[in-house]
Amino acid sequence: MVAAGKSDLSLPKTFACSAFAACVGEVCTIPLDTAKVRLQLQKSALAGDVTLPKYRGLLGTVGTIAREEGLRSLWKGVVPGLHRQCLFGGLRIGMYEPVKNLYVGKDFVGDVPLSKKILAGLTTGALGIMVANPTDLVKVRLQAEGKLAAGAPRRYSGALNAYSTIVRQEGVRALWTGLGPNVARNAIINAAELASYDQVKETILKIPGFTDNVVTHILSGLGAGFFAVCIGSPVDVVKSRMMGDSGAYKGTIDCFVKTLKSDGPMAFYKGFIPNFGRLGSWNVIMFLTLEQAKKYVRELDASKRN
């Protein structure tokens, strides 16, 4: 991120660095994302029901999945997850600087206002997920497969089979199921992540003794993850439930109301800890990788010029 200046890398190079960094973050943290999705899709026990919830907490959920389904199940959905990050990560992160510069004007000098950073994050998050929604849908569907009883036939044999099966059985439009809450979620979370990283990094660099190094990137990444989860959890829960149980809800508002009535307001923060564990670590890994990837590309460009 460049807090106030113009990007010193071309758009294709920025896109490539962003997509690569997002994919690294995805591979490293998808077990936590799988745990988050399972917790969000788990319905609260009915009043008087003695059945205890199957999944309890981040580590408990990860352990249960690994024990009952094998370690590989923790990476279920990694293929569409990487598809998603190549498209969505590359677009939302790669376009952030150009869009931010567009909003402030080419002749702007100084620190970019926080409002412009937020607006740029909302814009690139919304545009990016409109393209990448099918990959998000398939990822959630594959992660939700573990809800099926032991021995029950699986709907999909893999990512490509999931795409074709959904199109064949539900139509092409089904690939954009949950687009409304997904656009809202990703626009909000993207703005929270990128704007907060930008702002926190800019603030830290003004403190004597701090430089643009790994420590600054880690602190900024943790701040980005925290703000993203606090702001985006409710719409994230709605998105996961709509994509995981597509026939149970008529739309975004219907899903919100039914969730509120059946599970109460705290249901919108179900999985908060694993969500923060995932997004906090994802942001640290992604931004560290992004900063190093950009540094490497700059050095490579400089060596070619010399």
Curated annotation (Swiss-Prot):
GO terms for biological process: amino acid transmembrane transport; photorespiration; photosynthesis. Widely expressed. It comes from the Eukaryota. InterPro entries: Mit_carrier (IPR002067), Mito_Metabolite_Transporter (IPR050391), Mitochondrial_sb/sol_carrier (IPR018108), Mt_carrier_dom_sf (IPR023395). The keyword Nucleus does not apply. GO terms for molecular function: amino acid transmembrane transporter activity; oxidative phosphorylation uncoupler activity. Disulfide bonds: none annotated. It is a multi-pass membrane protein. One of its GO terms (cellular component) is plant-type vacuole. Keywords: Membrane, Mitochondrion, Mitochondrion inner membrane, Repeat, Stress response, Transmembrane, Transmembrane helix, Transport. The keyword Transmembrane helix applies. Solcar repeats lie at residues 9-102, 112-203, 212-296. It is found in: Mitochondrion inner membrane. The chain crosses the membrane at residues 15-35, 71-91, 118-138, 177-197, 218-238, 269-289. PUMPS are mitochondrial transporter proteins that create proton leaks across the inner mitochondrial membrane, thus uncoupling oxidative phosphorylation. This leads to a decrease in the efficiency of oxidative phosphorylation and an increase in heat production. Is involved in protecting plant cells against oxidative stress damage and maintaining the redox balance of the mitochondrial electron transport chain to facilitate photosynthetic metabolism. May play a regulatory role during photorespiration. Belongs to the mitochondrial carrier (TC 2.A.29) family. This is Mitochondrial uncoupling protein 1. The gene is PUMP1.
